[in-house]
């Protein structure tokens, strides 16, 4: 991939908003049976920041997932410190401190702390004790990179909130690879020629959430925001689910 393309990709990442967990839970409950035995890919999702990763990690056993894969950048600007790369085998301290792209692959989430529940502490334990659970990526972690495309090919279902400015390109890749997906996009995407064509051809549809209900997203510190809830800055965005 050309340097100019990589630069554009990094710039486009700044338009990403982080979905709140209750919104993910409310939509995913309609698809529970479809996740059993499946490999789920969250390929725009740093677990430090992403509630998509958090949802599927917390519900790994409940949903009966076979595998959960997330590709992302180390470090966090939103949900700092819930998972810590320091001490993870194969990750140098310099990589843990920098925004080094990496892949997390989860195939088992036991109750490691014996408290009867699955929580992020269990996932953190997995990352620090299973050498094949986390590996650094060769590229920048962009969903269009060769290694990330290969991961999408291997996945059964893709679930994420891609950058809105790259929505057309993201959906085009999903359709080209004939992937099942549940993603979030701007409501205006319905009017895009390419997206409207996919909707008309039954290649995708909107989700269960009422289209009249907009969504509130967590935003980084440098963004304008409308209110603070639970210590997080949130902003009202015209968005909906696509599947």
Task: Report residues per predicted region.
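Class I S-adenosyl-L-methionine-dependent methyltransferase catalytic core
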Residues: 1-243
